[in-house]
Amino acid sequence: NASFLALPIFIAASNTNESFALLEFIGIGIWASALIFESVADFQKLLFLRNMKKAKKYNQVCNIGLWKYCRHPNYFAEWMVWNGIIIMAIPSFLNLGALEISFLNSELSTILWGFVGFGMLYASRMMYVTLVYTTGAVPSEHFSALKREGYKDYQRSTNRFFPGPKKVN
């Protein structure tokens, strides 16, 4: 649901403090690094596809650059973009909990605050499930394994989502 994904952004934007908290700097750093990581992965894939097209080599496995370390570095980076936003929103979320909401009693305010916190964490989980299982990695890999010779070997030797060293078989 789009409202869960937007929740951390709305919370971060609600911050009334004039200075940044450490977690906001960390979140911004993660967000910016992940955005660069995603752009590099997408650019590497684009160059790979262009080079394969020029060489008339179709249905090849992209295992260059960041694609050596995981099969979907662009999806991983997209997920980290959202986690950076969530981390950036934590100080604002904690400030919301400290505010007294005059039109709500304290018990209802606490429950609402709990739901908002759960929603922020759920946004990360929801994005992960979407990128890996619903629309991303798993569906695309099914077709890649069918049409790309060597893709099953790539699957056996390379992490799906989280970047890391080659797997030892």
Regions found by a protein language model. Give the residues of each.
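Hydrophobic transmembrane alpha-helices
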Residues: N1-L5, I9-Q44, K53-N169
